[in-house]
Amino acid sequence: MDGGSGQPAADTEMTEAPGGFPAAAPSPQMPGIENIPATLSHGGRFIQYNIFGNIFEVTAKYKPPIMPIGKGAYGIVCSAMNSETNESVAIKKIANAFDNKIDAKRTLREIKLLRHMDHENIVAIRDIIPPPLRNAFNDVYIAYELMDTDLHQIIRSNQALSEEHCQYFLYQILRGLKYIHSANVLHRDLKPSNLLLNANCDLKICDFGLARVTSESDFMTEYVVTRWYRAPELLLNSSDYTAAIDVWSVGCIFMELMDRKPLFPGRDHVHQLRLLMELIGTPSEEELEFLNENAKRYIRQLPPYPRQSITDKFPTVHPLAIDLIEKMLTFDPRRRITVLDALAHPYLNSLHDISDEPECTIPFNFDFENHALSEEQMKELIYREALAFNPEYQQ
């Protein structure tokens, strides 16, 4: 949900956050707009807004004003008030959602996953807006709880971040990830823009369109996680990846928070691998055991890199934080620290409370992924999800 964010999430019982920060201004590409044209449609049950020449059609409970707050490849995000609940939400319009089957499945996956999950550190879906016509719709509108900004915007800003801020963000990412992994799910696309924040420093993980079941071993051709946060086993095309891929991403994100620039900003796959080996060193034969022969051969023909001292490279970072990061940025995923052990690491002693780090009691069922769904079937499944929120719109 790039760039989509403003209004606090529900108050939590979590450990008190460090001092908050002012909400980020709207994205420069999406200036605030007064008096966006609005027209009632379909007998007054819907409202059409005209935003930058795009039709944005939602149920009539989302009364004016409506504010564009973000834009991505998928479409546009607006903040709006639900007049029935008085809650502000971020509504993402996915335009032409069924033109591409892979994208349509991503949308369905995200909806089903977020409806299954219930956790303070995972963004919640508040509504799937039903289409006016059951059998003739191409756009999907999803309303999420509204947050103020995301970690990418904060890192790029000149907003001061204390070590306590960074530590608290790290804790919340791991707390959310514990729940995700306990649901038998890998996120697979953790990066700063997928971590939403509000002014209280509450953090919520979003964008589950690439999530996968943890026991799945076939490599997905659609897998396009941002290169900079990608674990070495994925860069080397290992099909047998585990929850450890998310832990690697968290290590990269934390160091980016501390240093205000990406840890491994690779230009391509080859450069990405070189950057990470320049820091953590060329893996030993023992550390290569989990890889296939092609990947082993590739690593062996690279020039050897000695391991650098992360402490020397980042002298201002707390020694306990360095110790945890070294355990996260371990080449061999079998030896990489788990989320549970990371939460229990001494660096997070002041925040860790196992009684307030819930797990998901029912694993997520990805069975719908196993069927070759037609466009009409995917439309029907998304329509049913919309009816779960809006039974009165049954047609």
Curated annotation (Swiss-Prot):
Residues 63-348 form the Protein kinase domain. The modification Phosphotyrosine is found at Y223. It is found in: Cytoplasm; Nucleus; Cytoplasm, Cell cortex. Disruption phenotype: Reduced sensitivity to abscisic acid (ABA) during germination. Insensitivity to ABA in terms of root growth inhibition (e.g. root cell division and elongation) and stomatal response leading to increased water loss under dehydrated conditions. Delayed senescence phenotype. Induction: By Alternaria brassicae pathogen infection. Activated by threonine and tyrosine phosphorylation. Activated by the MAP kinase kinases MKK2, MKK3, MKK4, MKK5, MKK7 and MKK9. Activated in response to touch, wounding, low temperature, low humidity, salt stress, hydrogen peroxide, ozone, ACC (an ethylene precursor), jasmonic acid (JA), mastoparan and UVC. Activated in response to elicitors: oligogalacturonides, hexameric chitin fragments, fungal xylanase, and the bacterial flagellin and harpin. Activated upon Pseudomonas syringae pv. tomato DC3000 infection. Residues 1-35 are annotated as: Disordered. One of its GO terms (biological process) is plant ovule development. PROSITE patterns: MAPK, PROTEIN_KINASE_ATP, PROTEIN_KINASE_DOM, PROTEIN_KINASE_ST. SUPFAM superfamilies: Protein kinase-like (PK-like). InterPro entries: Kinase-like_dom_sf, MAP_kinase, MAP_kinase_CS, Prot_kinase_dom, Protein_kinase_ATP_BS, Ser/Thr_kinase_AS. The modification Phosphothreonine is found at T221, T226. Interacts with MEKK1, MKK1 and MKK2. May form a ternary complex with MEKK1 and MKK1 or MKK2. Interacts with NDPK2, AP2C1, MKP1 and PTP1. Interacts with DSPTP1B/MKP2, especially during HR-like responses triggered by fungal elicitors. Interacts with MKK4, MKK5 and MKK6. Binds to LIP5. Interacts with VQ4 and IKU1/VQ14. Interacts with RACK1A, RACK1B and RACK1C. Interacts with PTP1. Interacts with FLZ9. Binds to BASL and YDA. Keywords: Abscisic acid signaling pathway, ATP-binding, Cytoplasm, Hypersensitive response, Kinase, Nucleotide-binding, Nucleus, Phosphoprotein, Plant defense, Serine/threonine-protein kinase, Stress response, Transferase. Its EC number is 2.7.11.24. ATP binds at I69, G70, K71, G72, A73, Y74, G75, I76, V77, K92. GO terms for cellular component: cell cortex; cytosol; nucleus; phragmoplast; preprophase band; trans-Golgi network. This is Mitogen-activated protein kinase 6. Transmembrane segments: none annotated. It comes from the Eukaryota. It comes from Arabidopsis thaliana (Mouse-ear cress).
